[in-house]
Regions:
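PAS-family sensory/regulatory domains
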Residues: 252-264
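Dynamic helix-loop-helix/coil hinge segments at AAA+ ATPase domain boundaries and subdomain interfaces
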Residues: 264-270
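Bacterial C-terminal helix-turn-helix
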Residues: 270-318
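N-terminal sensory regulatory modules of PAS/LOV and PAS-like folds
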Residues: 126, 248, 255-257
């Protein structure tokens, strides 16, 4: 079976067919990185010292992400899934799995310190998510390496407050009977968790700024702007950068919020955007204020204060 899978990968890559994003990843794996789909050695593992150095670079971020990772694992851990977080290079820094599944995931290299970059493992959830900077599913025989076709991986990139890719969030399943519908469901939860981590990291990066949610939602994440006391935009999430043409990464040169949100009264434009975001979250949570606050990445008390300031009642209405 492994030979059949490897032969299929090779014939697909060598064909002239343009193909899909998946076949493009297979082609990168073989032609750019020089990988062999029939290769059997396990993924590369970094030394304990190197792992600690990589964790230290993201120490504050990992502390902030821990509650979200714990919550995600509570949701999927009993279904034969592990929860992993990697750095931007695809090296696993943190993992969670049930004791009964731990040996399996360790044998597969889905454990702290292993390198799952696309250049190391070819097409896989973690590496391809990072290479393409998008949420995706790599299901069993979609993997480049034949030995990785036993797993299904659901991944989402995490972008830092500067708009640059900082990490990847992964849920991998060892269940051979996992359905496509359940895989899609988990993928949605992974993407939402990644957005929540991004939101919390962004708010933590601009503690003295007013955080404004844009009037429109985007699939790639929360549209958040950090506005200082002079109504200057000093920060923006990746999604906000796309929405307002602010450049995808790097430091933002402060600019008037009115230049971005319109000149019809900056304060009223900001309030309309913030009010719309709060009402969306409350409606999506069915009036559950705790759930709405979690989605917004703020505390329940903060949510109530903002509702009062913006004239939003307990039922989410003006």
């Amino acid at each position: 079976m492994s030979k059949s899978h490897a032969d299929y990968i090779i014939s697909t890559v060598e064909s002239d067919h343009v193909g899909t994003r998946l076949t493009a990843s297979w082609r990168r794996s073989m032609m750019k990185h020089g990988l062999d789909p029939s290769r059997t050695p396990a993924p590369k593992r970094f030394s304990d010292m190197e792992i600690q150095e990589r964790r230290a670079r993201l120490e504050g971020f990992m502390d902030l992400a821990t509650p979200q990772l714990d919550h995600l694992f509570q949701m999927v851990g009993n279904t034969g899934c592990s929860v992993l977080m990697t750095d931007r290079d695809g090296v696993i820094l943190d993992q969670r799995s049930k004791d009964a599944d731990s040996d399996t995931f360790q044998d597969w290299g889905l454990w702290a310190g292993f390198d799952w970059s696309e250049k190391s493992e070819g097409t896989n959830g973690i590496g391809t998510c990072i290479a393409e900077a998008r949420s995706l599913i790599i299901h069993r025989d979609e993997h480049f390496m034949s030995r990785n076709t036993v797993m299904s991986c659901m991944d989402a990139p995490i972008f830092g407050p500067d708009g640059e890719l900082i990490a990847a969030l992964d849920v991998s399943s060892c269940r051979a009977d996992q359905t496509e519908a359940y895989t899609r469901l988990i993928s949605g939860v992974v993407a939402q968790t990644a957005k929540q981590i991004e939101t919390e990291a962004f708010r933590a990066a601009f503690p003295k700024a007013r955080i404004i949610t844009g009037p429109e939602e985007r699939p790639e994440g929360a549209v958040l702007l950090a506005v200082d006391q002079d109504d200057l935009i000093v920060g923006a999430t990746r999604a906000a950068r796309r929405a307002f043409g602010l450049g995808l990464g790097g430091k933002i040169d402060p600019r008037p919020a009115s230049d971005i949100l319109g000149r019809d009264s900056t304060s009223s434009a900001l309030e309309r955007a913030e009010r719309a975001a709060l009402k969306r979250a409350i409606a999506r949570a069915g009036g559950n204020m705790s759930a709405a606050a979690r989605e917004l990445g703020i505390g329940r008390a903060t949510l109530y204060r903002r509702m009062k300031r913006l004239g939003i009642g307990e039922n989410g209405e003006n």
